[in-house]
């Protein structure tokens, strides 16, 4: 079983923004040394205490700081971006580090309504649906679009290209990924529904047995009940439920108030705690083993929901696949 890290680059306790970004880099180096397969960074906008706004910038930097680990976006929020330009960016990055670049793509806005309005201000009103934009991006990456002979994202799209992943949390998105033969990352740390995880994993693998199905989970090493309690207290979750059925999850009261102030929509707010896998190394591995035996998961991705730098490091060290042997891959970086 392969293990991966998702780092949302939070502002850490007692750290400046620059120091927190430094920790994002150091954690990538640590994961690289310890045999993790992938290290993903996210895209968020106008979010309190979250730094990562530009995964393409961080991915390029982290590839330069590591040797073996795959580095990727987890993910590019495609509703804010031109699919052709995203394909160009990650094709270029892939030329810098062949075989190590992953492009995860998500549908969520990754930020507040104000940020979404700012990011999409100049986009045409009849913006394509997410599925259309994703298929457009895939066609550029795969060189299968209608104008592929004259419109290219690079002078060379054969020697190296990014591995493409769809990020999602529903049966429909998993089926969409499988139908289009794209790897899939299920955001279990958002959905927190094991029955749904099993249903989605089984459906995806049935439709696309050759695809990678990755379950992204919230995981923290906690040795005592006191540490477990502290982790739970740090991770309150607010679900914003919109009239049209949409649900958005945020982690602070300020974010809740910002959403309410910046929209005319009626919103129902529900407070709960983030569902996490907490415990000792053996307890966490036992739970992961239970999940992998109950549904066809290819890899796990660990989201570390804490602003405590030491706890983040300890969790990554404790769960390290240190017996995995990696051959260093060639590249310019």
Regions found by a protein language model. Name each.
Residues 172-190:
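A conserved active-site cap/scaffold subdomain adjacent to cofactor or substrate pockets
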Residues 2-17, 80-144:
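Flexible, glycine-rich active-site loops centered on histidine and acidic residues
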Residues 7-21, 76-83, 158-168, 272-281:
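Active-site mouth loops of central-metabolism enzymes
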Residues 32, 59-67, 94-101, 144, ...:
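Acidic (Asp/Glu)-rich catalytic clusters
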Residues 1-66, 330-332:
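N-terminal beta1-alpha1-beta2 module of alpha/beta enzyme domains
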Residues 124-151, 195-295, 327:
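An alpha-helical appendage that flanks or caps ligand/catalytic pockets
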Residues 3, 31, 43, 62, ...:
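Conserved, mostly hydrophobic/aromatic
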Residues 3-7, 39-41, 71-73, 101-105, ...:
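Hydrophobic faces of well-ordered beta-strands that scaffold small-molecule active sites
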